Amino acid sequence: AAGFVKRHPVGCLLALACVLVIALLQSCSSSLVSIGNAGAGALGATTYPSEDEAILGAEAAYAGLEAELQTYLDTYESTHDYDEYHFDLDEIEHDPYVLISLLSALHEGEWTLSQVEGSLQMLFDRQYILTERVEVETRYDSDDEPYSWYICYVTLENKNLSHLPVSLLSEEQMSRYSIYMSTLGNRPDLFPDSPYVDKYITNPPEGYEDPGEY
C-alpha cells in the first residue's frame, strides 16, 4: 500500500479529497434535515391544530349562544310581567382568536366541534354572569289601598373572555394559549376583523418577535 501511494501520490490525494467532500456533504445534508425538522416543529407548535370547519364551527356556535342571550335581554320586558325594570348590561362580545386559542389550549391536539361543545358552554357561562333580582314594594292607590309593586333588576356582567385564561388554565395550557395568541395560530386570514390581527400581524409593537420564527 505504501508503494502504491508513492507511485500514485496525486491520485491518492484526489481520492482522499473526494472522500472528505462526500463526508462534508453528508454532514451538511444531515444538518439541513435537522434544521428543517426543527423549523417544521416550531411552525406546527404555533399553528391551530384543528381544521377550518371545526374552528369556524366553534366560533359560530359561541356567537349563537351570544345571540340567544341578546334576544333574551331584548325581549325581556315583553316576556316578563313585572311593573318596573332596571337594566345594567355589559356589551355582549368576544374575540374569536381568544376563543379558538383557549379551545386549542384546553384540548391538546386536533379537536372537532363535537369535542369542544362542553368547553364552549363552560366558557360562555364563565364569561357572562346574568343576575335577575325582583323586589316588591307596597304602594298605595288613590283610595289609600295597598298593592304590591314588582321591580325587576337585570344585570349582565361580561368578564371578558381574554381575562379567563389566568384562572382557568394550567401552566402548560397557559403557555400554549400565549403562543397561539401571539401568532394567531398562523391563521390571520380566519378572522381578519379581529383587532389582534392589527396588533400582532399588521402592526406588531416595536421589539415584538413572532414565536413562529424561532
Task: Annotate each PLM feature.
Residues 1-214:
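Membrane-proximal envelope biogenesis segments
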